[in-house]
């Protein structure tokens, strides 16, 4: 009634002393609308929302929608493949909106296996994240770039360890043992994940989610493929960029635990209920006690990121040079126990050797390089330990126990020397309290005994040449390598945490690994259009070899319990039994041929045929070759 009265008053230009204009404008009413395209065809499933609110709906089979609105609301209408549209709500009760096609989105070029395609003629399920999306974030790992950005892709963090990788699943779990997708950076399939890659060097990421898009990569693409393209320079003056960011990390949440008084009260009740005498005289005097989570967590752990780059180019070529430094301190144990540093260097360039489109043959030839080097240094603690790790002990150690042996007397010291040989001290000489509670120990003392060091050097590079043989036919050859050297060192001092957790002889464990992959690929791309018929043909070969070696050694009786001196060659091993070594090697070979045919009629009816034949040393002796075909079709 009020809305109707207001409309009549406004139409007649009258006013009424009992009607508040502000109240009228805030009155909620039903608005009906129709969403059409430029041809007058209803747009089904268009999104209509009120700006700044959670109110929204979608258009039905006839392009019609109804929505609760107020005068002055701003409606935002959007649909994939069309330009977004905004409308301000006035006094209208029926609305008609015409959406225009987003020709730029339809003409967008998307990276696919061994080439690019226009988005408008794709028949496969491919999602894309670009550098524009990255500029809004400060991710530390490539997987973090995809979090919440790509439908059908779940990103789960394995642990809170600084630099820890995330588990990526594309459209669910593919196999029981290994569901990780195949990562390909600048055409190079990677071994050991993408830790080495600096997210700020990324130009775009394409996620190949179905068999139609991933079949071109054969046997390794069963769990999907993630294609990463790094940045390159553009024609123009040199552009210098420097970015710096710093943040602070804290545990997302802490478990709610009893304080000392509550713990002693509960324990007394348990003993009484079991028919025994209470074990604590006056729980109220225990006070708050020790919150062990606060003792091991490193509050406001800093994370710092430096990024510098220079890029540019001219008529003959382009270049991109970048340096990155990431330092992430762990939220458990502090910098001495949990830390992650990554140094990255990248150089990409292209050079046009010659270009003459007037030639019938050999119209152009260009070469390029994509080179990336990364060094990672990290420290960490044991992860995902249900019982004996410091995190588990932090929530299960009694709160009425203290961190340190408080004001120890001569008798206390003598008792510790006799019964707890190797009791643990902090850097200032204070003695940690020994808590005998089976494998549940003083978590702060345990942190003092953990010494884990990892380092990793990785170089991924490729050199390529591309020749336009004649119009529409391009030949490309590339030689790539992935070299990695990584190692780990753990050392354990003589220590006594409880009768079940103790180290009677100091020891050090060292592991050294190296791996090298060589990849040689050749492709022919041919494109042809006849009237409204468009063809694209890809033929290619791929030859790959991978070799790795591992050496591991263990030695007892360190000469010095010092992180800088705890090495295998600096021990006092009394017998051959005090030392142990082992090693191993792996090798892998693969040879493949592949092809793809794309056809579309007037960019409305599309067909794609893909076939790859893999020969792999990983296959069974009697089945060393396998075929991976796919067929997909679509229309718009």
Task: Describe each model-derived feature in a short phrase.
Residues 230, 259, 308-314, 347-351, ...:
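Residues on the lipid-exposed face of transmembrane beta-strands in outer-membrane beta-barrel proteins
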Residues 1-355, 359-367, 460-461, 553, ...:
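Short, small/polar-rich motifs associated with maturation and membrane association
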Residues 244, 326, 607-619:
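Transmembrane beta-strand segments that form the barrel wall of outer-membrane beta-barrel proteins
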Residues 141, 165, 223, 303-307, ...:
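Transmembrane beta-barrel architecture of outer-membrane proteins
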Residues 595-610:
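Short, contiguous hydrophobic alpha-helices characteristic of membrane insertion segments
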Residues 232, 313-314, 353-357, 361, ...:
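Outer-membrane beta-barrel strand-turn architecture
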């Amino acid at each position: 009634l009020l809305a109707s009265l207001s409309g009549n008053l406004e139409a007649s230009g009258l006013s009424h002393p009992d009607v508040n204009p502000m109240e009228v404008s805030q009155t909620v009413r039903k608005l009906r609308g129709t969403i059409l395209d430029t041809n007058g065809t209803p747009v089904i499933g268009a999104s209509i929302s009120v700006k700044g609110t959670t109110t929204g709906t979608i258009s039905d089979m006839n392009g019609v929608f109804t929505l609760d609105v107020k005068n002055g609301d701003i409606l935002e209408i959007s649909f994939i493949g069309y330009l977004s549209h905004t409308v301000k709500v006035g006094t209208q009760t029926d609305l008609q909106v015409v959406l225009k096609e987003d020709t730029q989105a339809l003409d967008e070029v998307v990276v696919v296996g061994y080439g690019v395609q226009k988005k408008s003629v794709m028949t496969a399920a491919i999602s894309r994240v670009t550098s524009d999306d990255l500029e809004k974030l400060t991710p530390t790992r490539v997987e973090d770039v995809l979090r919440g950005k790509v439908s059908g892709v779940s990103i789960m963090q394995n642990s809170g360890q600084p630099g820890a990788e995330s588990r990526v699943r594309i459209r669910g779990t593919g196999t029981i043992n290994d569901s990780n997708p195949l990562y390909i950076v600048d055409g190079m399939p990677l071994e050991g994940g993408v830790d080495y890659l600096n997210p700020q060097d990324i130009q775009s990421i394409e996620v190949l989610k179905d068999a139609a898009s991933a079949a071109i990569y054969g046997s390794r693409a069963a769990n999907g493929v993630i294609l990463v393209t790094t940045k390159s320079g553009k024609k123009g003056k040199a552009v210098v960029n420097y970015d710096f960011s710093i943040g602070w990390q804290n545990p997302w949440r802490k478990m709610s635990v009893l304080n000392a008084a509550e713990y002693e009260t509960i324990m007394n009740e348990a003993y009484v209920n079991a028919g025994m005498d209470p074990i604590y005289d006056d729980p109220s005097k225990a006070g708050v006690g020790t919150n062990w989570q606060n003792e091991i967590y490193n509050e406001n752990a800093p994370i710092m990121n430096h990024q510098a780059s220079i890029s540019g180019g001219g008529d003959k070529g382009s270049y991109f040079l970048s340096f990155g430094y990431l330092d992430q301190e762990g939220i458990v144990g502090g910098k001495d126990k949990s830390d992650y540093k990554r140094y990255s260097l990248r150089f990409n360039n292209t050079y046009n050797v010659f270009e003459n489109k007037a030639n019938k043959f050999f119209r152009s030839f260009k070469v390029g390089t994509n080179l990336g080097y990364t060094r990672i240094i990290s420290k960490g603690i044991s992860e995902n330990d249900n019982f004996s790790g410091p995190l588990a002990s932090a929530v299960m150690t009694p709160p009425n126990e203290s961190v340190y042996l408080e004001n120890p007397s001569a008798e206390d010291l003598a008792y510790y020397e006799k019964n707890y040989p190797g009791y643990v001290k902090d850097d200032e000489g204070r003695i940690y309290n020994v808590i005998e509670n089976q494998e549940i120990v003083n978590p702060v003392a345990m942190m003092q005994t953990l010494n884990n060091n990892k380092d990793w050097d990785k170089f991924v590079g490729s050199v390529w040449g591309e020749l336009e043989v004649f119009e529409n036919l391009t030949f490309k050859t590339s030689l790539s390598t992935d070299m990695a050297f990584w190692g780990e060192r753990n050392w354990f001092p003589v220590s006594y945490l409880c009768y079940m957790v103790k180290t009677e002889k100091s020891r050090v464990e060292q592991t050294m690994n190296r791996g090298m992959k060589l990849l040689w690929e050749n492709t022919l791309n041919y494109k042809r259009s006849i009237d409204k018929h468009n063809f694209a043909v890809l033929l290619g070969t791929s030859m790959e070899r991978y070799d790795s070696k591992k050496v591991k050694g263990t030695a007892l009786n360190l000469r010095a319990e010092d992180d800088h001196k705890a090495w295998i060659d600096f021990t006092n091993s009394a017998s051959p039994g005090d030392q142990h070594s082992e090693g191993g090697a792996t090798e892998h070979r693969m040879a493949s041929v592949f092809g793809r045919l794309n056809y579309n009629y007037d960019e409305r009816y599309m067909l794609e045929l893909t076939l790859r034949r893999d020969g792999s040393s990983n296959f069974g002796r009697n089945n060393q070759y396998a075929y991976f075909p796919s067929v997909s079709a679509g229309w718009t």
